[in-house]
Design a protein with these regions (language model features):
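N-terminal Rossmann-like NAD(P)+-binding domain of SDR-like oxidoreductases, especially those catalyzing
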Residues: 1-181, 223, 296, 308, ...
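Short, solvent-exposed loop/turn segments at secondary-structure boundaries
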Residues: 90-91, 185-190
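Residues that form or flank phosphate/diphosphate-binding pockets in enzymes
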Residues: 44, 71, 188, 251, ...
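C-terminal substrate-binding subdomain of Rossmann-fold SDR/epimerase-dehydratase oxidoreductases
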Residues: 3-4, 24, 105, 180, ...
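Hydrophobic alpha-helix immediately C-terminal to the catalytic Tyr-X-X-X-Lys motif of short-chain
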Residues: 157, 161-165, 197, 256, ...
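Short, conserved catalytic or interaction motifs in soluble domains
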Residues: 43, 184, 247
């Protein structure tokens, strides 16, 4: 189907050169939109969007979200912020500023141009939860002073700003809480468990497990996550969130490590290290609301998604 340039929605994606943002760029372009990718390349990577640079309906702007920017757009997906402990703890002050000032700047832009805006929040707003699985009405159990607080509290403050702009200024917002997401284009040195395990297995190195390995996470494949985000953005204005997006299938770190070893054919052994402070023991979303409102749930099983991710890292490590 051919799209006239005048029929295309102009969509801004902050953090668009990152893992999740680049997949969102792909999908929104395929859907016939004009996409503006904004990134400062702190964790985003140009190689994630190289295949899009010749597309006449794709634009890249190098910009730091802590500074305002003036554009004419119809929709804004606000993804920009380091999302792994290795990256967000490297410069915790900058992490908090990116979440808070970035939200202020993007909400100000949305208010000015009357754009619809989606905040990519996080399951980290639940902290180390005492409620399991986590529902959107749960307020969380979060340390305000721990080493993860720069990310957790920054995202919580961003949510507050979104709802205040919605109530006070009638900005058309959406808020999604994203649980652990994985897939091709994950940063190889971001310290996330799936990328760590895969790279260690492919290199035949010990697979490092922090703690006893019985702590759990739920892992959602990136294509499923992108679908959920777009459905939320395009949904009716009578529901603005927050909305959990994630895979309700729970997996322990020991189970994940064994599955990665099996799929890679690796002979890696397990190595246990002390658990980091404030590391949640369990994390699993209740996605009843996403099912009810948007008929959304993940369709990619863990083995299938891991295999695609392993294939990506094999190619990356081989230099091809």
């Amino acid at each position: 189907m051919a799209f006239s340039p005048y029929d295309r929605e102009r969509i801004l994606i902050t953090g668009g050169a990152g893992f999740l943002g680049s997949h969102l760029c792909d999908r929104l372009l395929a859907d016939g939109n004009y996409v503006i990718c904004l990134d400062n390349y702190f964790t985003g990577q140009r190689r994630n969007i190289l295949h899009l640079l010749e597309n006449n309906y794709f634009e890249v702007i190098r910009h730091d979200l802590v500074n305002p920017i003036f554009l004419e757009v119809d929709q804004i997906y606000n993804l920009a912020c380091p999302a792994s402990p290795v990256h967000y703890q490297y410069n915790p002050v900058k992490t908090t500023k990116t979440s808070v000032m970035g939200a202020i700047n993007m909400l100000g832009l949305a208010k000015r141009v009357k754009a619809k805006i989606l905040q990519a929040s996080t399951s980290e707003v639940y902290g180390d939860p005492t409620v399991h699985p986590q529902v959107e009405s749960y307020w969380g159990n979060v340390s305000t002073t721990g080493p993860r607080a720069c990310y957790d509290e920054g995202k919580r403050c961003a949510e507050t700003l979104f709802f205040d702009y919605y109530r006070q200024n009638k900005v058309n917002i959406r808020v999604v809480r994203i649980f652990n997401t994985y897939g091709p284009r994950m940063h190889p040195s971001d310290g996330r468990v799936i990328s760590n395990f895969i790279i260690q297995a492919l290199r035949g190195k010990p697979i490092t497990i922090f703690g006893d390995g019985r702590q759990t996470r739920s892992f959602c494949y990136v294509d499923d996550m992108v679908t959920g985000m777009i459905r939320m953005m395009d949904g009716q204005d009578d529901f603005v969130g927050p909305l959990n997006l994630g895979n309700p299938e729970e997996c322990s770190m020991l189970e994940l490590a064994q599955q990665v070893i099996t799929l890679t054919g690796s002979e890696s052994q397990l190595e246990f290290l002390p658990a980091p402070p404030d590391d949640p023991r369990r994390r699993r979303p209740d996605i009843s609301l996403a099912k009810e409102r948007f008929h959304w749930e993940p369709t990619t099983n863990l083995a299938e998604g891991l295999q695609r991710t392993i294939d990506y890292f094999k190619e990356l490590l081989s230099g091809t």
